[in-house]
Amino acid sequence: MTTGVDSERPGAGAHGGSEAFPDDEEVSRDAFEVFRDDWGIPHLRAADALALARAQGYVTALDRAWQLETERHRLLGTSASCLGAEAVDWDRFVRRARLADTARRCFGRLAPETAAWVGAYVDGVNDGLAEGASRAPEFASVGRAPGRWEPWTPLGVWLSTHILFAGFPTKLWREEVADRLGEDRMTLFATDGPGTAGSNGWLLSGERTASGAPLLAGDPHRFIEAPGVYQQIRLACPEFDVVGLAVPGIPGIAHFGHTGGVAWAITNAMADYQDLYRERLRRTSDGGVEALGPDGWYRAHAHTETIEVAGADPETVEVIETDRGPVIIGGPGGDLGDALDGDLGGALDGDLGGALDGGSGGGLGGAPGGGSGGALDGGSGGGPGGDPGEGSGGDPGGGPDADSSAEGHRAISLRHPPRVTGALGFDVLPALLRARTVADLDTALDRWVEPVNVVLAADTAGGALHRVAGHVPVRPDVNRLRVVPAEDPAYAWREGEAAPLPRTEAVGPGGIAVMANERGLAAPLGVEFAPPHRARRIRELLGARTDWSPAAMADVHTDTRLASSRPLLSLLAWAPGLGPAAERLRDRLLRWDRHMDADSTEATLYARLRTDVVHRLAGHPALQGVTGADDPWRSAAYPALFRPWLAAVPRIGYALESLLTVGLLPYEDRLALVAASAEAVAAAAEETPPAPWGELHRLSPWQALPDRPSDGSDGSDGSDAEAIRPGVAGDHDCVLSTSGVPGVTDLFARGPAARYVWDLARREDSRWVVPFGASGVPGSAHHRDQTPLWARGALVPVVTDWGLLHPTTRHPEENPAMTAAEATTAGPAVPALRAAVHEQKVEGFGTVRLVPVDPSADVDLLHGWVTEERARFWGMGDHTREQVREIYEFVGSLPTHHAYLALRDGVPAALFQTYEPDADPVGECYDVRPGDFGIHLLIAPAEGAGAVKGYTDALLTAFIGFVFRDPARLRVVVEPDARNAKALARMVRVGFELGPEIVKPEKTARLAFLTREAALRLG
């Protein structure tokens, strides 16, 4: 058995993949080398791609043996055999969905070279499992040895990992909402919800980077598992040399990689490509099962399987498959009950196309196929497209049982592309490793199947890519929205057809492309998308600089601005009749910068207020049909596995922003509800002051078996709370999306499952981090050594120099600390640290610097200035912080208008705004001359030693110096409020000539002008 070859020379071979093994060494074609960096991350070299795949499987078995065993059991539906009764629900679903059978089918249809490559990976897994299991204490805990992997096992792992990824159980929730609240409320709760997984990703062209080459960065958001769902790895052979984030159990690098020539990343497209069909089933006299299809009753495939349960009796599950797909809910015995036999069944018998009218289908957009009518026409003549397996094919069987209803019992089947087509997209994986350009990558992705992703990519030759990849079937739009009747041919898939996949210009004129699961490129393919806040915020942050570097990307990864707080805080601002404590709470939250920072007690207060509002909404009569005793979560009609999608309180929490703005409740009721919550939260805060957000907002990862108490050998301080469940910043709709369940818990299980920065200038300047470490073995030095870095947003370097790596198949014993430059990121934006657009020393006053306004970082400062009584002529005295921020975001978006802070010796002293009069409403009030240049001034109060004589005139000297340093500017225009006598007198004193009064919508102003000649005379 060939395992690995330890290198005798750490620096042997070149850095590129073309010299993976030195020419003067004779090595077996099966041989490989395992190197590790200081973080235990494996770097693998082999003589060819097959040996490299074997190496990848082998090292994954060493590092993640228990994780691989867990995944193998999950795809087979045998988890309960070692984890007990709590795993039965999953096992039952996997058996009924026939995931293992689908994996076998898809493996059988792989290209021969791909099948050999996957087989080599499996050989490596089997080679390494015994040693890996000897290191992993979990095997002893459950008294099991690892099971052997089959060639098709990786495909099954991929299926089981992603089968719930597209969120088909949400269709069950929509049916419940339609039945209980009405058809027009079906999409009331539409938003990024309990079962979805998303990501951030962004691409910067060279015009926005310090190196002049593209940067690609982001972070996938998934349920965080320990060990992690991503594995940092490097794969090198003569054909390629790739770094990236692999999925343990899957060969190659599917989602995030850098080949040296091209880098790519993905986010969930939020597409809908899995359908649920309402089936009618009946038992035959010989014990078989019949299903009702478009052509009448026919014999369906049916067999039974046994689920072994540790510590309990085994269970028997009946596996049924119709022409649509495997039955996952209900059966011929009627166990689905009233949920589909009663009113809901009646709703499904009606005109489903009507769900697209009257607003409930507004999220579907222009779906492929030319609307539901075109899809209906196309589907009616097509066959079902599935291969339900043995026992199908229309055999009438033994006829209906005398005790069975002639109409049949209700059930639900699942139809998804791999089961129908026998393709899972694994032929793409080796092609990704060999890609050298965006064109190579694009061609490979044409064969991608699932999950359906949005892809960003860039190469070193200047190419870029922004597209959707995956298989979305062509069928009626309504299939995406709800459960549809199996016997009606109108709802069939168009056999052999796939929806066209959108693509767009990779990088726009601003040099920025963003993907964050929003309703954007993939809008025609889905129903529910993430709110736009993350995408907007990322664009805002990236647009603020043109010198981005890999290290600076962490500033974006860790941004905590919570834009979705606006509706709730707006209602709080106007909540009537608050008591003193609630007034103090309101004042505090309205002054809050809306950043969910770990050290913020205001963030905690906001979270408490949000939770209380969620529960009050859940108790409101408007939602009583889906809450309390009527909560679909309590229904016995559906398997317990689907309860996260059916629980009302989390649905309300995730959709709170829209529920507080749509017409669900009258405005007065919303105000009263928020006022009541404010009183309750304020009273609690008076009694128990809030803790910092990071003390409550802790990671709660999923683990098949909990860790043993830490003794500090894993690199932690011995504290399980901090080593396993660190407190971090962020929230559901922040760029730093650490998502708890609003209204249920502040703990979070979904968040950045990795972070990456791919540098197209120098791959060795790329960076990455995962929540835990390279090793899944408790007690290893690299089990959780990246957790502190991940928690604070730091990244570790991607090492590409073989000479800096450790040639071993074992983890290095020591983990040297990172340098400060490697482990820290830039702090918050401080005005004094920003690059100045103008700097001028004013004699007797100090140095005046003009720096751009950062609307988010400066909002407290600006709001404080513009709402003071002395600034009443500025016209923003009653504005909220959010309104002030939005105004200056808008100003910053205009090429003709700019806002600056004037700093006197580093201290903010004034707000200085400039504009081009012919691009401003003031230009309509007078005859604009060539060279006119408008300014607005708001001087901050000077206190203490700063209150020197001539303070304002000194600042004006610097402002005028800035304006007239451009020879194209011939005249300064100001327009103070006509009532502001002090400002007018000041302008005259420094040389302005008064012009006429003008009437603007917000004020009557007096124009004043300062020519270049007059300014020179003053100088």
Identify the meaning behind each predicted range.
Residues T2-G342, G346, G350, D377, ...:
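C-terminal/peripheral segments of proteins
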Residues E916-D918, E975, E993-L1007:
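Conserved catalytic-core motifs of GNAT/GCN5-like acyltransferases
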Residues E889, S893-G944:
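Acetyl-CoA-dependent GNAT
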Residues M818-S856, R1017-G1019:
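Conserved N-terminal entry element of GNAT/NAT acetyltransferase domains
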Residues V963-P976:
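Conserved GNAT acetyl-CoA-binding A-motif
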Residues V973-L984, P1001:
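Conserved beta-strand-loop-alpha-helix junction that forms the acyl-donor binding cleft
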Residues A947-F962, A985, R989:
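Conserved acetyl-CoA-binding loop-helix of GNAT-fold acetyltransferases
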Residues G931, K1000-G1019:
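C-terminal "cap" of GNAT-fold acetyltransferases
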